[in-house]
């Protein structure tokens, strides 16, 4: 089924974001592992796998709409140097993804591509209710209990 150009443009934009988020989570997870913060490593590695799954869903949809996904393009990533900075960069990225998903869903509605919209709604729910929410909680914990206590709680 041939997709509408406006919808495909949005799907490609989202794919670039998911690939970048995956890579940002990848480097951050390995940094946490290197620092001995095993709980953070495990959670952020899980987030990386979720972003890979989101990218896979977008790739499958783009292919269904008879276009070839471009995996050579992705948005820039921001690598933090401290745990709070890394968590904040990841949260900022999730907020950007949320805004892009909502924009893309509006385009899907306008173009009457309800299947793409429904797919994006599932990704949005995961992004808002899991990824962004968890990151907000971690930054809140750092404020409440202090960075040193937080870091100690993230060791295995």
Swiss-Prot record:
Enzyme Commission number(s): 1.16.3.1
Localization in the cell: Cytoplasm
SUPFAM superfamilies: Ferritin-like
All residue ranges annotated as the Ferritin-like diiron domain in the record: 1-146
GO terms, molecular function: ferric iron binding; ferroxidase activity; heme binding; iron ion binding
Residues binding Fe cation 1, per UniProt: 18, 51, 54, 128
Catalytic reaction equation(s): 4 Fe(2+) + O2 + 4 H(+) = 4 Fe(3+) + 2 H2O; Fe(2+)(in) = Fe(2+)(out)
Binding positions (Fe cation 2): 51, 94, 128, 131
Keyword Oxidoreductase appears in the UniProt entry: yes
Superkingdom, taxonomy of origin: Bacteria
InterPro entries on file: Bacterioferritin, Ferritin-like, Ferritin-like_diiron, Ferritin-like_SF, Ferritin_DPS_dom
Inactivation phenotype: No visible growth phenotype in iron-sufficient conditions (30 uM Fe(NO(3)3)), in low iron conditions (no more than 36 nM) cells grow at half the rate of wild-type. A double bfrA-bfrB deletion grows as well as the single gene deletions. Even in iron-sufficient media both single and double gene deletions have lower photosystem I content (PSI, which contains 12 Fe atoms), store about 50% wild-type levels of iron, and undergo iron-stress.
Sorted UniProt keywords: Cytoplasm, Ion transport, Iron, Iron storage, Iron transport, Oxidoreductase, Transport
Induction of synthesis: Constitutively expressed during growth in the presence and absence of iron (at protein level). Constitutively transcribed in the presence and absence of iron.
Predominant localisation class: cytoplasm
Example GO BP: iron ion transport
NCBIfam families xref list: bfr
PANTHER family: BACTERIOFERRITIN
Subunit structure as annotated in this protein's UniProt entry: The bacterioferritin (BFR) complex is formed of 24 subunits (BfrA and BfrB) of unknown stoichiometry. The BFR is arranged as 12 dimers that are packed together to form an approximately spherical molecule with a central cavity, in which large amounts of iron can be deposited.
Protein role: Part of the iron-storage bacterioferritin (BFR) complex which stores about 50% of intracellular iron. Iron-storage protein, whose ferroxidase center binds Fe(2+), oxidizes it using dioxygen to Fe(3+), and participates in the subsequent Fe(3+) oxide mineral core formation within the central cavity of the BFR protein shell. BFR rapidly binds iron in labeling experiments in vivo during iron-limiting conditions.
Identification of the protein by name: Bacterial ferritin
Organism: Synechocystis sp. (strain ATCC 27184 / PCC 6803 / Kazusa)
Source organism phylogeny: Bacteria, Bacillati, Cyanobacteriota, Cyanophyceae, Synechococcales
Gene symbol of the encoding locus: bfrA
